[in-house]
Amino acid sequence: MNAHQIIIRPLITEKNTNLMRFNKYSFEVDRNATKQQIKRAIEEIFSVRVTAVHTMNVRGKLRRRGRQYGYTPDWKKAIVTLAEGDRIDLFEGA
């Protein structure tokens, strides 16, 4: 997998915006990606130094369409801690 296949999209929410004060950024990542692969992908794409990666699997939510019930897909979330002084400019306008 290359770096752009591992990192699916950044997550910009109120909670994640508060984490940015502590140099932590959140991303939706490929479900099969490991912490080492996520670290290398972030360092390659954004040219920053990653000190820690925390991952979690998020279960899909129950959704209804008329009388039919289904679930949204499960996905994986990664919270990446950057080295002191490094920033990701993509999040700064949020």
From Swiss-Prot:
A Pfam family reported for this protein in Swiss-Prot or TrEMBL: Ribosomal_L23
GO cellular component, one term: ribosome
Record-linked PROSITE patterns: RIBOSOMAL_L23 (PS00050)
Record keywords, A-Z: Ribonucleoprotein, Ribosomal protein, RNA-binding, rRNA-binding
BP terms from Gene Ontology: translation
SUPFAM superfamilies documented for this protein: Ribosomal proteins S24e, L23 and L15e
Cysteine-cysteine disulfides: none
GO molecular function: rRNA binding; structural constituent of ribosome
InterPro entries: Nucleotide-bd_a/b_plait_sf (IPR012677), Ribosomal_uL23-like (IPR013025), Ribosomal_uL23/eL15/eS24_sf (IPR012678), Ribosomal_uL23_CS (IPR001014)
Family the UniProt entry places it in: Belongs to the universal ribosomal protein uL23 family.
Function (record text): One of the early assembly proteins it binds 23S rRNA. One of the proteins that surrounds the polypeptide exit tunnel on the outside of the ribosome. Forms the main docking site for trigger factor binding to the ribosome.
HAMAP family (alphabetical): Ribosomal_uL23_B
NCBIfam families per record: PRK05738.1-3, PRK05738.2-4, PRK05738.3-2
Subunit structure: Part of the 50S ribosomal subunit. Contacts protein L29, and trigger factor when it is bound to the ribosome.
Protein name per UniProt: Large ribosomal subunit protein uL23
Natural source organism: Roseiflexus castenholzii (strain DSM 13941 / HLO8)
